[in-house]
Amino acid sequence: EVGGVKAKLDEDGHEAVVLEQLEIDWKFSNNPLQTADNELQARIIVREVFRENGLDVTFNAKPIIGVAGSGEHTHFGVMAKLKSGKLVNLFSPEDMRKESASSLGIGAIMGLLKHYEAINPFISSTTDSLNRLKPGFEAPVCIVTSLGTDPSEPSRNRTILCGLIRDIDNPMATRYELRSPNPYTNTY
């Protein structure tokens, strides 16, 4: 069983139809255009591999009513390259143990939340994508965020719109995860 969908077996116990959700992760790119290209390329590869094996695949946000939908959580952060060549994560605070995010990082999340109603039509542009954003399926249902109760422990609330992702020992890992996109969101 994956995402609340049970595999369909025939009377001999052989799989007749398998319904599963697969999660695909890849390393981020410092180039936003390359990141969008990677996402599109991954979708094409998955579709072709399934087709070559006689299987169907869908990237719909809510292919089956009553079970968890398909999200495409998008992580974003901002880095600067100093004259010395060193990369600095602009969302990381100076003291990772005392603060959750830098003032720029807090400003970024505040701007996203404030303007999300204007941004959302580009993210959730179909009825199918809006069907995914319902209570009870670990999808965002409100325009809210949570940075966690303590800088050492970010929130893992799966119903928030945008969450803070960080590693207290790695300032370069600080970023936000926007949870509302789906596989048909235009990443570009």
Predicted segments with their positions:
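Active-site capping/gating regions of soluble enzymes
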Residues: 1-3, 10-12, 16-188
